[in-house]
Amino acid sequence: MKSTVEKLSPTRVRINVEVPFTELEPDIDRAFKQLAKQIRLPGFRPGKAPRKLLEARVGRGAVLEQVVNDALPARYSEAVTAESLQPIGQPEIEVTKLEDNEELVFTAEVDVRPDIDLPDLGALKITVDPISVTDEDVDAEIEALQKRFGTLTGVDRAAEDGDFVSIDLSATVDGKDVPEANTEGLSHEVGSGQLIEGLDEAIIGLKADESKVFTTTLVAGEHAGQEAEVTVTVKSIKVRELPEVDDDFAQLASEFDTVEELRADLKEKISRFKRVQQAEAIRDKAIEVLLEQTEIPVPEAVVQAQVDDTLHNAIHGLDHDEDKFAESLKEQGSSREEFDADNRANAEKAIKTQLLMDSIADKLEIQVGQNDLTERLVLMSRQYGLEPQQLLQMLQQNNQLPAMFADVRRGLTVAAVVHGATVTDTDGAEIDTAEFFGPSGEQAEAEQDEAAPAEDATEETDADSDEAADDSK
């Protein structure tokens, strides 16, 4: 088999393949065996009919068509391997020549990973905001705990901002009742702004069993976007009483005995949360800087496929109704034009990022270990509420393991990029990235060197123990 490659663009090639008929003999034999099992000829047992009789029955052309269909995928893969190509997406294959007993010639056009001129990774500089945990941060968490363990007590007065009320609602549009907007005994925190616009203002000043009518725009249902007359009736008013922040409260709200211990724990949790946010900012900034410094051609067909997939997922829940989709976007303050523009921009950025990370991974020779895959599998199984083995079977059935492998490799690549970069905060302080990106190569080697003497000492101790045991026998 011979193959050549024509570069159509930085991201697309045409592979020309010539296959001598002698190399197709195994495929021809296989085709006749399949036909022999499918076709019954008088005087012959199933699967035992001679080639000539089978060929006479179905025709030589049908046999060759079956041979070509069976042979193309393997010959295409062989050509891709021989030419060291890295396809992304499915090929467009065309048979250009098929001469019996001579040769099969076909072409395959396919998008491929482009050659990317990478910047100097060692010169990469990443700057993010510094981390600080203030007393106000801790106070906010304490207040949240107070609210969680607070009690609601009824009051005999008009509703105020921050009160908790039970309300009945009804609405009309153009004088006609809107059944889906009617509700009774709805709990609501005054001032939260969680329901319809104008509700909080209407409630404030009302006492129990008092009502008020106000005008608002409905945001959901059949009458979404229409102006409605809404009647709100207050049924009860309660105020939240917060517990005093003392050691008893600490014991009620946590596993700690004192407020001091509780505050220290909250401070550490806030610090870790902010460190996680900072690590995410470092990752995003590293990718952002690399994308700015690198020219990355993207295959249009791959971009369009992702654009179509995102659109399909967005509109699928609306029964693919374009009008409903447009109305949904309007409710969110957007439009179809904005959605399409954002969708394409996001698709292009995502594909550029993948191509960039894959190229860097190749350059740095990033290897994915079994532990890396296991950690990702366990993490994903927790997110989906499945057993790891159950999730693994689902990924295998849906052929998603290669995608998971690629994603893990890209994550390891980002970590390697961060290790090689200079990472500081805006105050100029260098940031230790080991907590979330793992130790650098030098740090890992140093840790192994430190662990080695301890392991040797353990082995010597075990040997001494064995000798002592032998002596005692």
From Swiss-Prot:
It is found in: Cytoplasm. Residues 444-473 have a biased composition (Acidic residues). It holds the Pfam family FKBP_C. Residues 162-243 form the PPIase FKBP-type domain. It is an enzyme of class 5 (isomerase). Its EC number is 5.2.1.8. Keywords: Cell cycle, Cell division, Chaperone, Cytoplasm, Isomerase, Rotamase. One of its GO terms (biological process) is chaperone-mediated protein folding. It comes from the Bacteria. It catalyses: [protein]-peptidylproline (omega=180) = [protein]-peptidylproline (omega=0). Gene3D superfamilies: 3.10.50.40, Trigger factor ribosome-binding domain (3.30.70.1050), Trigger factor, C-terminal domain (1.10.3120.10). One of its GO terms (molecular function) is protein folding chaperone. GO terms for cellular component: cytoplasm. Residues 433-473 are annotated as: Disordered. Involved in protein export. Acts as a chaperone by maintaining the newly synthesized protein in an open conformation. Functions as a peptidyl-prolyl cis-trans isomerase. Consists of 3 domains; the N-terminus binds the ribosome, the middle domain has PPIase activity, while the C-terminus has intrinsic chaperone activity on its own. Belongs to the FKBP-type PPIase family. Tig subfamily. This is Trigger factor. The lineage of its organism: Bacteria, Bacillati, Actinomycetota, Actinomycetes, Mycobacteriales.
